[in-house]
C-alpha cells in the first residue's frame, strides 16, 4: 500500500479482492515520481512509458470521462 503510483488511470485493471491489487496500463509522457518501476514502451515515437507498479488499495479515478 502507501501512495498510489498514479493520480488517475483510464486503462486500470484491478483484482476483485479487498484490498484490490491494481495496475495501470496508460501510456504516459513520463511516469510520476511515486512510480518505482517505469518501463519504456518499445518503438514508441514520441517516447511513452508505462508504470509497471502494482498498487494495493482503492482503485484510482479515471483521467478522462468516456462520453
From Swiss-Prot:
<keyword id="KW-0722">Serine protease inhibitor</keyword>
<keyword id="KW-1015">Disulfide bond</keyword>
<keyword id="KW-0646">Protease inhibitor</keyword>
<protein>
    <recommendedName>
        <fullName>Bowman-Birk type major trypsin inhibitor</fullName>
    </recommendedName>
</protein>
<comment type="similarity">
    <text>Belongs to the Bowman-Birk serine protease inhibitor family.</text>
</comment>
<dbReference type="Pfam" id="PF00228">
    <property type="entry name" value="Bowman-Birk_leg"/>
</dbReference>
<dbReference type="InterPro" id="IPR035995">
    <property type="entry name" value="Bowman-Birk_prot_inh"/>
</dbReference>
<feature type="disulfide bond">
    <location>
        <begin position="35"/>
        <end position="51"/>
    </location>
</feature>
<feature type="disulfide bond">
    <location>
        <begin position="31"/>
        <end position="38"/>
    </location>
</feature>
<feature type="disulfide bond">
    <location>
        <begin position="8"/>
        <end position="63"/>
    </location>
</feature>
<feature type="disulfide bond">
    <location>
        <begin position="9"/>
        <end position="24"/>
    </location>
</feature>
<feature type="disulfide bond">
    <location>
        <begin position="14"/>
        <end position="22"/>
    </location>
</feature>
<dbReference type="GO" id="GO:0005576">
    <property type="term" value="C:extracellular region"/>
</dbReference>
<dbReference type="GO" id="GO:0004867">
    <property type="term" value="F:serine-type endopeptidase inhibitor activity"/>
</dbReference>
<feature type="site" description="Reactive bond for trypsin">
    <location>
        <begin position="16"/>
        <end position="17"/>
    </location>
</feature>
<dbReference type="InterPro" id="IPR000877">
    <property type="entry name" value="Prot_inh_BBI"/>
</dbReference>
